[in-house]
Every structure is written in structure tokens, then in C-alpha cells.
Regions:
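A short SAM/SAH-binding and catalytic strip from SAM-dependent methyltransferases
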Residues: 118-130
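Short amphipathic alpha-helix with an adjacent loop that forms part of the alpha/beta core around
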Residues: 54, 106-115
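Conserved acidic residues
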Residues: 61, 118-119, 140
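S-adenosyl-L-methionine
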Residues: 1-57
């Protein structure tokens, strides 16, 4: 997260002003994702699938979230994998706002990874950076997500086949930016009529893509675990409360 401290403070002031306006529930999460959410859109189904993948590898899997920020996605994973950990390169995001850093988040970069882990989750890679080879050295499986308009969606460069991994699965999650037009309606002018909303819904193109890469010896186990989950247990009605903003 390559921000100067003064930029963070300016953003935080804008965030506080927005909160003082008593906005609709969960809107701050998507308008100010740095402070209240994550840089990528996710739903409960994404968390559950990630956990299923980890448990297909081991009964007690090791898991690291690389570039976890304040740990929004990581905290959801930890509800099911209590030993999951995160790493964050920029400690200033905690110190600048006197936010207590959880013990399960270590201040380090992906280049400093040394311990082997069952699953590495990569939800953010700064523009121009490429730390995949460091992740590949330590992880047995990599789950990564990126949006269609980001550096990975446009230019690729987020695949792991060149490091000896095989792509096991992929899916997509509708992203917020073109799902709920009101989120980008800064002054909350009157809502669009139903007909206009239906027209806009047909134009939805922004998505977060999720890709799963694994060492060849693990692909069959992960595929089997995911297929079992999809057929037997996945419930489309099992959602986080903030998902109401996405639909």
C-alpha cells in the first residue's frame, strides 16, 4: 500500500466526514475500503471455498494472507481457521492511526517469507511489483484474486504455472463498482427507477476473479474437496450482511 502518511490522513478526514453524514449501512465499506473493508470484493462463498481448499490439504492447515492490510478478509478466514496468519509490509498503516496490530499479523514483506505454508492467499499486489516467486517457494497452494480492470486483469502476470503450479479451479465474484450504482453517487441524489436499474444490470462487467494454483501432487485432493463442497454443502443463501450492498 504505497501511500505517504499525509495522504492517509487526508483520506481518513474524508472518511470521517462521510461517516458523520450518517450514510446507508455498509456503504463506507466499499467507498473507503482501506479503512472499512478490503481492496477486493468478496462474499462469504469466497471465504468458505478458500477454507475448504485449505482443509483439503491438511486437517490443520497453515495459512498466510499476504498483504493483508488491517485483516478484513483474514478475520473472516480465522473464524474457521483460527491459526491463520497475515503479513503486511507497511506498518505505518497501524501506527499512523494508533490502531492496535493483532499478534497474528506480522510486519514483513513477501520477499521475507521463509516458512512453508499449506495455503498462501494473495489479494493485493502493488502496481509494478511481482513477488510471486517468493510466494511459490513457500506455498503448496496459492489462492489469488484480482479485478478485471487491475494490473493482473489487464496485463496478466498473476499466474503461477511458471513456478511449477497447476491451476486447479477458478470462479468470479461480482465486484461492487458496477453492481450498485448508488455507491458511486457521491451526493446521494434520487435513486434510479427500476427500469434504469435493470438496464444497468445488463451491462455489469466488473468482476473479481479467483484462481487456485497448487503443486501437482495436491490438485486431485483440492478438486475433490471443492466438488464435494459444491455438491453437498454450499448454500447460496449463506451470506455476510454486507453482501446486501452488492445486489
Amino acid at each position: 500500500m504505497p501511500f505517504a502518511i499525509h495522504e492517509l490522513h487526508n483520506a481518513y478526514r474524508a472518511y470521517r466526514q462521510f461517516q458523520d453524514s450518517n450514510p446507508p449501512l455498509h456503504h463506507a465499506r466499499y467507498i473507503f475500503p482501506f479503512f472499512r473493508g478490503s481492496y477486493f470484493a468478496y462474499r462469504k462463498v469466497d471465504v468458505l471455498r478458500t477454507v475448504v481448499i485449505a482443509k483439503a490439504i491438511s486437517v490443520n492447515p497453515s495459512y498466510v494472507d499476504i498483504g493483508c492490510g488491517y485483516g478484513d478478509f483474514l478475520d473472516k478466514v480465522r473464524q474457521l481457521l483460527p491459526d491463520a496468519r497475515g503479513i503486511e509490509k507497511h506498518g505505518s498503516i497501524f501506527y499512523a492511526f494508533q490502531i492496535s496490530k493483532p499478534d497474528y499479523i506480522n510486519l514483513m514483506s513477501a520477499e521475507d517469507l521463509s516458512e512453508s505454508v499449506d495455503v498462501a492467499f494473495v489479494g493485493w499486489m502493488e502496481p509494478g511489483q511481482d513477488f510471486r516467486r517468493f510466494v511459490a517457494k513457500c506455498a503448496k497452494c496459492v489462492v489469488t484474486t484480482f479485478d478485471t480492470g487491475g494490473q493482473c486483469g489487464i496485463s496478466s502476470g498473476c499466474e503461477y504455472e511458471e513456478f511449477g503450479f497447476q491451476r486447479v479451479a477458478w470462479w468470479r465474484t461480482p465486484s461492487w463498482i458496477d453492481v450498485n450504482g448508488q455507491l458511486m453517487n457521491r451526493y446521494y441524489t434520487p435513486s434510479l427507477d427500476l427500469g434504469k436499474k435493470e438496464q444497468l444490470a445488463k451491462l455489469r462487467t466488473a468482476h473479481n476473479f479467483w484462481y487456485v494454483y497448487a503443486k501437482p501432487e495436491l490438485t486431485a485432493r483440492i478438486e475433490s474437496g471443492l466438488q464435494w463442497w459444491l455438491k453437498k454443502l454450499e448454500d447460496p443463501n449463506d451470506r455476510f450482511d454486507f453482501e446486501s450492498v452488492l445486489d
